[in-house]
């Protein structure tokens, strides 16, 4: 939530397990991280949590994902929602049918029965992203019963900060980066011999790139380079399996609530 002064604090206030984010009580969760930190993966994990609740009998909340890299010039958040809704549910019927279905979606939004997962504040390709961000702020204010989970990059969030500063119930979270010790443990779990793990550790320390290992994407590339494809296979993009599970077992740094 906003700081008592009305501003987001830059100081860390504690930690939170990623799986607990859905129960954090924030109406808006801003999930920030460096490139390759797993922001989209966290979002997908949250969507699955909502889906599990749905399958277990809680049919009140429908998760809907919106990719901001698909927003085109001049579009507002309402336009992005309509596009995502049509694509997500395969609505290819007549325009009248689309309007009727979307009117029902708007009713669900007004009732707070849709949770929106908005991915990529940093991926807006429009010439004036601040206009879209303003429309997003208005959208959040309009549908004040809905929950929003939004991802973006830490350093680029400053440009959006003002738009979220005045919104009540907004939590800001940073993805914590994984430590070298945790990565070495992961390599042991993969079955690498201790001598290769020690060699990997020494190469990292000598090169002074320990901090670069902190995100899944960087780790995949560095491990493949130093260990070789015979010992470490780069997981498929978008399906990094056990590697991302290790990062998901890390935590979120609570920046402001």
Predicted regions: what is each one?
Residues 2-256:
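P-loop NTPase signaling cores
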């Amino acid at each position: 939530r906003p700081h008592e002064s009305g501003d987001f604090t830059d100081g860390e206030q504690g930690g939170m397990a990623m799986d607990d984010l859905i129960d954090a009580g924030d109406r808006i969760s801003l999930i920030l991280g460096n490139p390759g930190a797993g922001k989209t993966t966290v979002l997908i994990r949250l969507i699955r949590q909502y889906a599990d609740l749905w399958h277990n009998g809680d049919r009140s909340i429908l998760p809907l994902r919106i990719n901001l890299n698909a927003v085109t010039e001049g579009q507002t958040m309402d336009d992005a929602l309509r596009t995502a809704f049509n694509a997500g549910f395969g609505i290819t019927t007549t325009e009248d049918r689309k309007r009727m279905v979307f009117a029902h979606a708007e009713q669900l939004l007004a009732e707070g029965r849709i949770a929106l997962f908005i991915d990529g504040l940093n991926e807006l390709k429009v010439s004036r992203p601040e206009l879209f961000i303003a429309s997003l702020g208005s959208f959040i204010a309009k549908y004040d019963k809905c929950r929003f989970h939004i991802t973006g990059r830490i350093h680029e969030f400053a440009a959006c900060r003002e738009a979220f500063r005045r919104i009540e119930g907004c939590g800001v979270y940073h993805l914590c980066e994984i430590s070298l010790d945790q990565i070495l443990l992961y390599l042991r779990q993969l079955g690498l011999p201790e001598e290769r793990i020690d060699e990997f550790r020494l190469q990292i320390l000598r090169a002074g790139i320990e901090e670069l290992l902190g995100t899944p994407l960087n780790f995949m590339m560095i491990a493949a380079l130093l260990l070789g494809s015979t010992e470490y296979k780069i997981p498929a993009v978008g399906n990094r399996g056990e590697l991302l599970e290790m990062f998901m077992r890390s935590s979120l740094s609570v920046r402001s609530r």
